[in-house]
Structure formats: C-alpha cells, structure tokens
C-alpha cells in the first residue's frame, strides 16, 4: 500500500444513492419521470458507465434483485461477495444443508425435552432477507430427523415482493403441513413489527409477544386472517400480529424452547433476536422475558451471541481499511435507515475501528410511511457534508430516500424523492468544486426506477436494473463493470494500490 499522497490531486467523496437504477421505459419510472437537471447534466458532460448490481454479478442467484447489504459489501470488497442466500442455496444443492450440526442440535433439543421447535422468519421468495425455500427445507429436515412438534412464526413481506402476495405461498405451506400432525402456523405478523431496525421497540415487542402466544388478533385459518387484513386495507408488510387459536398456549415460545430464525440477513433480525435472548446489544428489555440457550440464526447476526448455521464469506481488506492505511482521514455519513450500510456493510460486514475515521448519523424520520416525507433526511445529510466535509480526505455517504420511498410503491412520492435528491447532488457538486473535492456517484441496487408493474399496480421491491457510476473528473474515461469494480476504481483514482484480495480491476480506461 502506498503511504505517500504525491499523486493525489483532490480529495474524494463516494456518494452511494440507495435504490436508484437505470431503466429506459418511463412508465412507473420515478427517476425518468422526475425533473433532474443536475443528473441530466452529469450524464451529458461527465464520465459515466453502467454498473451491474444484481444476480451473479454481486454473489446472488441468477436473476435475483440486488439489495442494500449485498450492494455495500460488494462496493467495499473489491471482489464478488457471496452472501447468505448463495451460501445456503449451495448447501441445499450439495446436500450439506441436511447435515448442518446447528440445526441438528436444535432438533435434538426438541426431541429430548418434548418442547416444540420454534421456526420464525420472513416468509416470501424475495431473497433479500430470507427465502421460503429454506423454510420448506427446514421443515422436511426436522420431520425426517424426528421432530414431533413444530411451530412456524411467519412474517409478512410486502416490500421485497408484491405488497399483497403471501396467500399462494401460505397455501403451498398448508399443503406441506398436512403431512405432519403437529406442525402448525402459530403466528403471523408483518415485518413492520417483527423486523424493525430503528429501535422502535414498542413495535417489535408486539411481534415478539405474538411468538409467546400473546396478541390481540387471533385466527384459526391463516388464509382467513390474511383476507381479514386485506379487507382492512392492511398489506403483508403491516399485518397486525396474530396467533393461531388451534395452537396450545403452552406450545408457543417459552423457556428452553429451541428456536431457528431463518432470516440470513442480519440487520432486521437483530432487534427481535435481542428481545428473545436479552443481549447487551440494546438497552430495551422485553416485558415478558423468556430464557433459551438453543437459538440458531441462519447467518451471523452481529452483536447476537447464538448458534450460527452458516459461516459468511470474510472481507479482510475492504476499501475503508486500505484508505485508512494510506493515511487518509475518513468520514462516513448517512441517516439511520442506511447508517449500517456505510459503516458495517461497506467495511465487510464487521464493525471496524479505523484510525482518523469519523461517523456521523443523521436521524431518520420516525414515520409509518416515507411516502408522506419523501425528502427523508437528504437535506440534513447534505447540510452536514457542507458543514464538516472539508476536514476529511475521503468520504462515503448514502442517500436513502429513493429506496425507502420507492418501497412504498407511491410513484408521485418517489418522483418527489428523486427531485429532492437531484437538488442535493447539485449542492454537493458546487461544494466539491469550491473545496477542491472530486466525487464518484453510484448506487447499490435499483428500486425507484420501477414503482409500478405492467398492470399499473404498485411495485415495492428492488429491481435487477444496472446502476450508474459517474465521475466528476472530465479527464478520465470509465468502462462498465459491476459493484466489485468500484473499490479498485477509487484506489486507482487516488493513486493507491489495491489489495491482492481484490480480484476486480479499476474501471478507469488507461491510455495505451
């Protein structure tokens, strides 16, 4: 790693826009339909290229939409990071899934104690936080191993898939459960309750209580309950926690019951896991605590001490670490919704303590729908950059509003979010020129460019469209690539060597 700065002419900001892909069709396209004079000028006058941000190009299954966690991991790593879903799918393909010692430990505990096995997680084929195929495999594995009682606690998705799409999957699940006498859907709740990541513990505790068999809403048929929620105008994401009256009260989650949480993505699994295990990760403690020593997470949940079924791919030398070793002073800047992504995820999925590195968190608005506040904290993030940015050599920042507003499926709100973002990018362009900064702009995955499906219905999920890479330096040319090329590109631009772990190259076209 080069220690001198003699080749570095300017300081650099990496602007990561969350959920903004590039799509030619204008229908339902919150980016194309927005008035974006700044982006228009950048695309016309500055070096830019297309970046693959989904599927096998980022370590996901073919055709799988990208997501924020995977996107930031790949941006920082300099190589394709194979994460949760790919690792688990490969274990299913090779059969090693059905030899997993952590699952077997939970099964044996259930058989030995007579307590039901409690399996919980996001029930959809979305592939961002979980996949229902993994649940189906767990059910078969448990049954073949001899587990007699099994309770399922399903979290409605409605974001990474259509907002009202769970019914056919529950019907599939019911058909499977008919083969097993004491395997039941014990509770249903929306991810809004069970998968919060913003310390909304009043909300999370409602999801937690449903695991314990404590909820205001009840059902005897899960399909009937879904229909009841739809009639109230409630989509999958916001299902009010409910419990199955056909499940014996003593069979809901209680002391010493074995638990498997089949979400592989950690960020939205940590708070609920904390309530069950009563960790030191958060101050909040459950009003109805239970104790269990057999809690299996699909992948590692940072800060949660439990059994981990599958080991993650390690990123030992991410971009931020190399920048630190070169003596650059760094800043990471984002609002709450994406703060973990510009710190934990872009640093390889670990909490790195880097010298000469500061982190600034701007609070996200605590609202039920960002469609009502499409600006989110974009203005405050830009204000903070303009206030303190000149003190740093290298800055990674994130704008969350295209993604979070895109998740609402509200086209008008998404257009507004993009227009607000465009204005903030314009402010940064002016500031960068005044303060002698260069910048690269990219995105972690698509979303805002497709807020309606072909029938005009809201689309709330991510996409497989490519994203942008824009440089403020008109003296260079960029070729197309994938997110794993971004770290080598930045290091190359700054005159620094990439680490040998980084098997992807810079996208800056060299003169022959």
Curated annotation (Swiss-Prot):
Substrate binds at residues 129, 159-160, 191, 197, 265-268, 338. SUPFAM superfamilies: 2,3-Bisphosphoglycerate-independent phosphoglycerate mutase, substrate-binding domain (SSF64158), Alkaline phosphatase-like (SSF53649). It comes from the Bacteria. Mn(2+) 1 binds at residues 403, 407, 462. One of its GO terms (cellular component) is cytosol. GO terms for biological process: glucose catabolic process; glycolytic process. The active site is at residue 68. Its EC number is 5.4.2.12. Its cofactor is Mn(2+). CDD domains: iPGM. It is an enzyme of class 5 (isomerase). Pfam families: iPGM_N, Metalloenzyme. Mn(2+) 2 binds at residues 18, 68, 444-445. One of its GO terms (molecular function) is phosphoglycerate mutase activity. Catalyzes the interconversion of 2-phosphoglycerate and 3-phosphoglycerate. Belongs to the BPG-independent phosphoglycerate mutase family. This is 2,3-bisphosphoglycerate-independent phosphoglycerate mutase. It comes from Mesomycoplasma hyopneumoniae (strain 232) (Mycoplasma hyopneumoniae).
